[in-house]
Amino acid sequence: MTVPYYRDVPTGNALRNFFKIMLKRKGNLFTAIFKELCLFLGLYFLFMVIYRLVLPKSGGQREIRKIVENLLSHQEFTIPLEFLLGFFVSSVVDRWRKSLDSLAYIESCAHAVVIGFPPNSNGSDKNLLIRRTIIRYLVVSQILLYREISLKVRRRFKKLTILGKAKLLNQNEIDKLNKLECKHYDIYFLPISWALSLIEDKIDKENLANEFTILWGQIKEWQTKLSLLRNCDYIPIPLAYPQAVFLAVRCYFAVCVFTRQHLDRYDSKMHTWITFFPVLTTFQYIFMMGWMKVAEILLNPMGEDEDDFELNFIIDNNLKNGLDIVSGLCGNHRKLAEHEIENDCRPYYQTNEQDRKKNRAPPESLKNVEFKSFTMEKASKDSPMVVKSESVCCLRRRFNSSAKKHHDSKV
């Protein structure tokens, strides 16, 4: 589930927000890169020990130093790290945003179902079963798709028989799904077809096609969002692209193990701690590798990371809210009565003065600007504004006449 943190940054206090965000445990940057950072620093110090203690005895230190200096001179030009990461992360975030927009919530469909199949006023609600069945079919269609793209949902609904145990489908409906179930094609569209068949039966019996226009549109939007999620899963970013980026970042820092060493053993500053610990290189590793980890996490938002979508919650939410709406549990308000707010619509806040200042009405930028009293009159003929206007008109006449003469000469 995506880690919430907006509650920790309610104001623009930069220092407070920094510590609040950095001390978050779940979804933390350092948690994501800690193991690889330890591996990088371990290799760095291992090469340092070999270079300073082993190579001087074997006499190969000078040759190794020349190789490292040659790598250092070509490293920044050979691996364009910022360009690769920037373009790749923007592409991944764009696909993540499209997947987020394609998560379907059922409230609009449920309201449209109530409009299409309204409850009877005499107390006997004959349309209640139809409304509940349509909501059930829509939720089942969502489950059938999510179990194909999310391991969490797949683990929850391993087989179609579990839908029967959860009372989402009866045995006859499960048998129909089993007949169509295939390893290569979708079956999520079938419950949507069942829901549409119920609407078609109502139209044929009562000839009420216009009354179901809103419901048709909502079910179509529901199916469109499911199709977009399916397409994002079927057609990912070409595999060679993330391979190139992930390999480039790790190769870059593998080279940094050698090129960021302090190679001069006879430097007078070599005994300070800054010589032995790569401070700036560590910062660069945290930022660049953390940037890449963002892309790795967002690459599949239907996975099992801490920042991935909680699709099981969406399924449960849609089933509960959808059935409540069509069953009338969310309120069947039909009686109209006068209310005091119709005569007194002033805002209602706490009596705390500090809270009142925070919630003050935002006026327009020039709302309370007042000008000194002045009089207005038409401009005289000698006014600069009038002269400027007339001069512009004269220039336009001259330009038009010259253009006309030029055209006549060509003819």
From Swiss-Prot:
Localization, UniProt: Cell membrane
GO molecular-function term, one example from the UniProt record: chloride channel activity
GO cellular component: chloride channel complex; plasma membrane
Span of the signal peptide: none
UniProt KW RNA-binding keyword: no
Keyword Cytoplasm recorded: no
UniProtKB keywords: Cell membrane, Chloride, Chloride channel, Ion channel, Ion transport, Membrane, Transmembrane, Transmembrane helix, Transport
UniProt membrane topology term: Multi-pass membrane protein
One Pfam family it belongs to: Bestrophin
InterPro entries: Bestrophin, Bestrophin-like
Role noted for this protein: Forms chloride channels.
Assembly notes: Forms oligomers.
Family that this chain belongs to: Belongs to the anion channel-forming bestrophin (TC 1.A.46) family. Calcium-sensitive chloride channel subfamily.
Protein name per the record: Bestrophin homolog 26
Naturally occurring in which organism (per UniProt): Caenorhabditis elegans
